Amino acid sequence: KEGLAPYIAETALRNLYLGTGIKEEEIEKYLKQFIKDLPGYIEDYNEDVFHQSGTVDAGAQGGSGSQGTTPPATGSGAKPATSGAGSGSGTGAGTGVTGGQARTGSGTGTGSGATGGQSGSGSGTEQVNTGSAGTNATGGQRDRDVDAGSTGKISVPKLKAMSKKMRLPKAKAKDVLHLDFLLTYKPQQQDISNTRATKEEFDRWYDAYKKEYEIDDTQMTVVMSGLMVWCIENGCSPNINGNWTMMDKDEQRVFPLKPVIENASPTFRQIMHHFSDAAEAYIEYRNSTERYMPRYGLQRNISDYSLARYAFDFYEMTSRTPARAKEAHMQMKAAAVRGSNTRLFGLDGNVGETQENTERHTAGDVSRNMHSLLGVQQHH
């Protein structure tokens, strides 16, 4: 009701904050007091509802909510066939009396009738039957005749993306593939590529790196950004060592590379592949403010600065990479690794011989490796 403020009962508050529950006696007290103080409020919501029953003519057209029955009309003369009352539309007009019922209808208008001393109101359908021909006038529209020259709606058939008829791998006469799953399985290429470290490996490297530097996550974001820019310029070869640097305004900060390389698994370049998109966007941003080409591209002598965004060695090629960019990146990679010689085995540190020498020599022997030759001396 208007003018009444919202109210929360004490029992509701106890149930909300204490969970004590509500008893029927408490609700009954509130209801009695409510009826006593606001009788008009209760009366407005105690409305009586009446339902009217009747027989619906399923063949009636042109109206809604018609009451009564409509028997078929036969014979000659004008004879209405609707009991009850209603309004409708039709052609012509007619009057009739059947069994003490009076009915008057017009082409477009309303009609009223009485049956057994009871009157009703509503909307219905007027029907006028004249002569043996039995002309029927209805308020609704007639069904459209079927035109032999018309054509139906033609739809283009949709082919299935994967047919059941294709040959699939089977195990014990059962398919081993789930076709419905394949239709919705569209992972990112980078997430399942074996050239990029898994998320678990990256998390392990990140935690070990942070632990070695003894910094928090907020400081790590700054350090990781500086490391990415340093790798754009200097590459991410696993053979690099020493320190890496980043600038703090005009001051140069030096960080050791040992924890960066040692904790990278499988390789440092596979770790850095996670930074590929960010590095590409950074190079593009630098080129929007100044001419910028990473050192990796300067060594390859690239003259087209539009390819600068691909000129770093941990760039990750995808299906969206343009063909010209892929060719340029592969040529740069081929030039970078040209002349490199990777040995599977290095020099074995165990160079001592394990063979035991059992030869016995004396001072009279000719040499260390030769026995006496009957007094012959060997001079060097």
Curated annotation (Swiss-Prot):
Keywords: Capsid protein, Nucleotidyltransferase, RNA-directed RNA polymerase, Transferase, Virion. One of its GO terms (molecular function) is RNA-directed RNA polymerase activity. Its EC number is 2.7.7.48. Residues 54-154, 349-380 are annotated as: Disordered. The record marks 52-53 as: Cleavage. Genome polyprotein of potyviruses undergoes post-translational proteolytic processing by the main proteinase NIa-pro resulting in the production of at least ten individual proteins. The P1 proteinase and the HC-pro cleave only their respective C-termini autocatalytically. 6K1 is essential for proper proteolytic separation of P3 from CI. Residues 67-84, 129-140 have a biased composition (Low complexity). Residues 85-99, 106-123 have a biased composition (Gly residues). It is an enzyme of class 2 (transferase). It comes from the Viruses. Pfam families: Poty_coat (PF00767). It catalyses: RNA(n) + a ribonucleoside 5'-triphosphate = RNA(n+1) + diphosphate. GO terms for cellular component: viral capsid. Coiled coil: none annotated. Belongs to the potyviridae genome polyprotein family. This is Genome polyprotein. The lineage of its organism: Viruses, Riboviria, Orthornavirae, Pisuviricota, Stelpaviricetes.
